[in-house]
Amino acid sequence: MITYHDAFAKANHYLDDADLPVVITLHGRFSQGWYFCFEAREFLETGDEAARLAGNAPFIIDKDSGEIHSLGTAKPLEEYLQDYEIKKATFGLP
């Protein structure tokens, strides 16, 4: 099991590989780990819509394995988190 501190550090390291500078804009805990949302630093600093990311799906870090799982953008975050909880309980994911 990993700690929140470890998960947050891992999330930032994961985002270091992005094509442009990004910032975590929302993060929190759910029953199976932590979720992270992010946006382009330039958009946050300038408000320039042209700098806004498209398709920047949230991701989770599993509390037991420390694995990163990308989510989607078609549904609300809460639905993806519930889906993950159900799949993990049913199939033992990850």
Curated annotation (Swiss-Prot):
Alphabetical list of InterPro entries matching this protein: Imm35 (IPR029082)
Pfam families cross-referenced by the UniProt entry: Imm35
Top-level taxonomic group: Bacteria
Protein name: Uncharacterized protein YrhB
Taxonomic lineage from the root: Bacteria, Pseudomonadati, Pseudomonadota, Gammaproteobacteria, Enterobacterales
